[in-house]
Curated annotation (Swiss-Prot):
Name of the protein: 3-isopropylmalate dehydratase small subunit
BP-aspect Gene Ontology terms: L-leucine biosynthetic process
Binding partners and assembly: Heterodimer of LeuC and LeuD.
Enzymatic class: lyase
Length: 201
């Protein structure tokens, strides 16, 4: 998992509340168990006018030329609600997104995102709306998300503070998932195992 310290990137927005995981990655694309290859199906029902995904929806924000290459997504409250599919953060990350900014997230989606190196940032409704307004007003608008300083800097230079659990921050800063955490403690685990008694049948 790639570490997340500070990221500056082009921002795109989906001005909708309650964006659920079935919209993020529809159920027909969940057959894979590896994390790659989901980006093309991200927001499939909104991005495409046909089932095959051959006809892009020209009115959907992620299809607009001005947002090509966006790496920060801004949305409204309760982002990631619905089923607990881990494929949702996989699809967002595979598309190239590094951070999602919203007033609130579904709890399971929030945890799944952190576990997969995608930073979910909670800001107030007012702060999120300001970011959306600034991004809409200026093509190429970039936002900086600094996990070390726990700040978000808007295109105009306004700085907003956010909070995240210390353990989640540590894992993201160091690029540690569950396996990485276990490997980081390999010596302690080995010492503990060496102390275990050997039982004979």
């Amino acid at each position: 998992m790639n570490p997340f310290t500070s990221h500056t990137g082009l921002a795109v927005m989906i001005d909708s509340a309650n964006v659920d995981t079935d919209q993020i990655i529809p159920k027909q694309f969940l057959s894979k168990v590896t994390r790659d290859g989901f980006g093309v199906h991200l927001f499939h029902d909104w991005r495409y006018l046909d089932e095959a995904g051959d006809e892009p929806n020209p009115g959907f924000s992620l299809n607009l030329p001005r947002y090509k290459g966006a790496s920060i997504l801004i949305s409204k409250e309760n982002f990631g609600c619905g089923s607990s599919r881990e494929h949702a953060p996989w699809a967002l990350a595979d598309f190239g997104l590094r951070a999602i900014i919203a007033p609130s997230f579904a709890d399971i989606f929030y945890g799944n995102s952190i576990n997969n190196g995608l930073l979910p940032v909670r800001l107030t409704d007012v702060e999120v709306q300001q970011l959306m307004d600034e991004v809409e007003a200026s093509e190429g608008a970039e936002i900086t998300v600094d996990l070390e300083e726990l700040t978000v800097t808007s295109p105009s230079g306004a700085v907003f503070n956010f909070e995240i659990a210390g353990s989640a921050r540590h894992n993201l800063l160091n690029g540690l998932d569950a396996i990485g955490l276990s490997l980081a403690c390999a010596d302690q685990i080995a010492r503990y195992e060496a102390q275990l008694p050997t039982w004979k049948a």
